[in-house]
């Protein structure tokens, strides 16, 4: 213990001696470093083309005709103004030594290019002004390491597009001015990704026709969209801008604002829709804007009819002190010039809204998506009453149930607890209309198909009990399986008890038999149709073949008939006695009873149809007929011997 105490005392003694020495050494080194830095920096001088003030912390070089950034700018400069010169390019490391610079003004020059690394070293830069130059692209690479940049001005540059992640290197931005980009043609969906600290955005006079995606700007408070071309403002245009307080959409040719278009702007305080083409607004359009106190609707051609009455009432209640803010009636003629707040219901005869497409009862299985439609006039408002008494509108926030823009009630997935009656409530200035539908959610067990059928399953069981001879029916409801969008039913199981000795039979009737029977009937009908078709086809083919053969035979007969001449001569049975001698001398040599000798053939004018042609010579045959020299013989006629009572015919060919 004594040794330990001596070591401890010795250690404290050395600490007491060394600590003052270390402290004095550090002070000397700091003093030497300061002297060396002052010596290396030399005297602070202001560039000859600039004017300096506040001990060189403010340097102004405007309107000096500079074509580049001047050299020799003091290193302790906090404010540097180079506006209205002819600077065309900013090279890398131009401002590297200006570590304390907070404001850099380069507007109204001719800058066309900014190199990557042009703003290196500006760790303290707060504001960068590049408006009124000739930039065609956003110099995203030059914004690297500007960790404290709060304001960026790029207005009035011929920038053609804003790509994705154009400003993700400067997440500290709070004000971004992109106004008057008259050459702008495209804004990417992810153009403003990473700007979660942005408070002010100017996109006015950029020739924008569709609202860009502003969802990443969760902290945006002021939005300038005036001077563009928006024919209509749709729901979701300002999605995600729950912190927005001021919205300007002036002189943008807006002619239609759909209902629920401003539902997401819960923090909006000021809204300016002046100098547009609005003639009416949907019922209760401003109801979700609970903090709205300043509204500008003047210089619009308002049509003062039943659809404008709700706006007149709303203005009188929420903005009673400023009747000139919201314009005058443009139509009808007897209302022209009257302030909107002066319009009352006595001037019109209005009717309650009608529901064009009412919701229908729906049976659906658990876990599926569902919709209950309720299509209504565009200038009315739609709300839904749930079975538990909750009222939902488009602006409501529910984890699974939402009201779509067209009034449809949408379920991302249904639960058994969603079963009940849902009522669609449509309202306008004259009244309201309601339509209800029943949603039945069943369990998703045995869900093997998208649709279920109307089925009744009967289960018959038996008990062996002599005393129980009566049948008992006990209906047991079970849930329907499957999913059917509009028409389905629950399955009913009937348990039937009968007395059958020592037998257990469980017959079940399912829709499979019915489906099989229907399928057999369809197949039978199909076979009959096919058989009829085949029979008709074969009959037509047979008729075609017969017709072809008859036609061919007819053609052959016509050819043969045209090539021959048939001459029939009738010979009487009784021959005169005077001719018997001649018959004996006939060259045929036919004799005996029943022989007939043909008479001598002489030339007859009626039978001889051959005429001698010019220069032709004729000969005579054995019959004495004149023939052409080429014909020297002629077949002798046939002698046909028949019964005495028959007639003899001679055929000469």
Swiss-Prot record:
It is found in: Membrane; Postsynaptic cell membrane. N-glycosylated. This is Leucine-rich repeat-containing protein 4. Glycans are attached at residues 277, 322, 363, 388, 410, 434, 440, 447, 450. Disulfide bonds join 46-52, 50-61, 304-329, 306-350, 374-424. Residues 549-653 are cytoplasmic. GO terms for cellular component: dendritic spine; excitatory synapse; glutamatergic synapse; plasma membrane; postsynaptic density membrane; Schaffer collateral - CA1 synapse. Residues 39-75 form the LRRNT domain. Residues 39-527 are extracellular. The keyword Repeat applies. The keyword Nucleus does not apply. It comes from Homo sapiens. The last 4 C-terminal residues bind to the first 2 PDZ domains of DLG4. Synaptic adhesion protein. Regulates the formation of exitatory synapses through the recruitment of pre-and-postsynaptic proteins. Organize the lamina/pathway-specific differentiation of dendrites. Plays an important role for auditory synaptic responses. Involved in the suppression of glioma. The chain crosses the membrane at residues 528-548. Interacts with DLG4. Interacts (via LRR repeats) with NTNG2. Forms a complex with DLG4 and with NMDA receptors. GO terms for biological process: excitatory synapse assembly; modulation of chemical synaptic transmission; postsynaptic density protein 95 clustering; synaptic membrane adhesion. Specifically expressed in brain. The gene is LRRC4. LRR repeats lie at residues 76-97, 100-121, 124-145, 148-169, 172-194, 197-218, 219-240, 243-264, 267-288.
